[in-house]
């Protein structure tokens, strides 16, 4: 049966995440002084990371939280994407919802019906994916620290907003280098060799 934000049937409640429902809090949540961008306040390095429910996904988060807290729900199955980000997305929702119920992992490499049935028949303990979750946390926090601190630093130095990121800035640099190489290209004569063989 389709309900608002989930499906129910055969002893299961099935719901979904819409991207990252829970995200790292902005600097001003840690301290109001960070509302104003100042080089004197850099670097911003949280001692205890804080998370907020994304404004655009509050409704779906609320649905997930209620489902997790239902008294007839004994355990949770993490069926998010099989990868680092899927692990992070689920666990942040689970933690932010204050859920303490046991959870297992459905790991799929195919969306075919047989593969899904096989996956449910062999659910994995959540602890098998702790390292994947920790890797995702490291990536997320590194992105935040580089993005927040470098963007604020270079925006202050430049005098207007300038976005800097762990991935986007090196890619932009490679694009600029390639564009400069194309602009500086000078055509040169070249020769090809033809070889005619006779038996």
Where are these regions (language model features)?
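Prokaryote-biased recognition of long, low-complexity C-terminal linker/tail segments
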Residues: 143-199
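Intrinsically disordered, low-complexity regulatory segments
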Residues: 1-140, 144, 170
